[in-house]
């Protein structure tokens, strides 16, 4: 017990600078070509309006050191151009599918609850009583209304200000999708309307 304690104390007592760990013996740079250093080529720099001859040497300055003029700030980075191709907009990772489905779910959830409160019908009864035509019409209108700005190159993030941001719309749409499925499932299990 005492020797184990002494060994542990000797490991922790020595500073990190006293122990050398040589990783070059474990891994040589030749066996890993990506670890070799690439030494950069020398680069010359000239001030604007300065001498252009290579032979000219700067004149010794007799006055105090003057501050160098500030270089102009770099231009802001260019925003990537938004693709307006139909296949890019409706791609799985594109800007349209989740937003369109979320908008449809928000409208559908509110409409399902409104009809349930007014007529007392559950979601499955609403669909069988002519809800399919309402669903198809709403889907066509909201899809076209969502795609028109995207075809013009307007991104969703550019129009989000205040509390109505694009992230809030995404999350509201996700919750509405879950809510609509949960409403239909609950009414199916319960056998009647939720409210």
Swiss-Prot record:
One cellular component term from this protein's GO annotations in UniProt: chloroplast thylakoid membrane
Subcellular location(s) per record: Plastid, Chloroplast thylakoid membrane
Induction pattern: Levels increase linearly with increasing light intensities and correlate with the degree of photoinactivation and photodamage of PSII reaction centers (at protein level). Induced by high-intensity light, at both cold and warm temperatures (e.g. 4 and 22 degrees Celsius) (at protein level); quickly and transiently induced during deetiolation, and accumulates in green seedlings following increases in light intensity. Induced by UV-A, red, far-red and blue lights illumination in a phytochrome A and phytochrome B-dependent manner; this induction is promoted by HY5.
Chain intervals with Low complexity compositional bias: 56-68
GO biological processes: cellular response to blue light; cellular response to far red light; cellular response to heat; cellular response to high light intensity; cellular response to red light; cellular response to UV-A; photoprotection; photosynthesis
Transmembrane segments: 104-124, 131-151, 175-195
Membrane topology: Multi-pass membrane protein
Disruption phenotype: Reduced greening during deetiolation in continuous high light, with a reduced ratio between chlorophylls a and especially at the highest irradiances. Slight reduction in the rate of chlorophyll accumulation during greening at moderate light intensities, and lower zeaxanthin accumulation in high light conditions. Normal sensitivity to photoinhibition and photooxidation. Impaired seed germination, especially in high light conditions and at warm to hot temperatures (greater than 22 degrees Celsius).
Composition-biased stretches (Pro residues): 69-79
Assigned keywords, A-Z: Chloroplast, Membrane, Photosynthesis, Photosystem I, Photosystem II, Plastid, Thylakoid, Transit peptide, Transmembrane, Transmembrane helix
Location of the transit peptide in the chain: 1-46
Location, primary (coarse class): plastid
Chain positions covered by the region annotation Disordered: 46-81
Role according to the record: Prevents excess accumulation of free chlorophyll by inhibiting the entire chlorophyll biosynthesis pathway (e.g. 5-aminolevulinate synthesis and Mg-protoporphyrin IX chelatase activity), and hence prevent photooxidative stress. Probably involved in the integration of pigments into the mature light-harvesting pigment-protein complexes. Light-harvesting chlorophyll (LHC) a/b-binding protein required to ensure a high rate of chlorophyll accumulation during deetiolation in continuous high light. Involved in seed germination. May fulfill a photoprotective functions.
Protein family according to the UniProt entry: Belongs to the ELIP/psbS family.
Name this polypeptide is given: Early light-induced protein 1, chloroplastic
Species, as recorded: Arabidopsis thaliana (Mouse-ear cress)
Gene symbol of the encoding locus: ELIP1
């Amino acid at each position: 017990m005492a020797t184990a304690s002494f060994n542990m104390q000797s490991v922790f007592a020595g500073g990190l600078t006293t122990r050398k760990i040589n990783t070059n013996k474990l891994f040589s740079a030749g066996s890993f070509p990506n670890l070799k250093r690439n030494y950069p080529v020398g680069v010359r720099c000239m001030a604007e309006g300065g001498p252009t001859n290579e032979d000219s040497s700067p004149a010794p300055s007799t006055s105090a050191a003057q501050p160098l003029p500030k270089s102009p700030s770099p231009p802001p980075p260019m925003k990537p151009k938004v693709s307006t191709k139909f296949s890019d907009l409706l791609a799985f990772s594109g800007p349209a599918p989740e937003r369109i489905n979320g908008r449809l779910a928000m409208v559908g959830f509110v409409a399902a609850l409104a009809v349930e409160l007014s007529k007392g019908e559950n979601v499955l009864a609403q669909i069988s009583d002519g809800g399919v035509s309402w669903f198809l019409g709403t889907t066509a209108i909201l899809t076209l209304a969502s795609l028109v700005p995207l075809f013009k190159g307007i991104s969703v993030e550019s129009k989000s200000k205040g509390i109505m941001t694009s992230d809030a719309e995404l999350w509201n749409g996700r919750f509405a999708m879950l809510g609509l499925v949960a409403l239909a499932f609950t009414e199916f299990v319960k056998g009647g309307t939720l409210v």
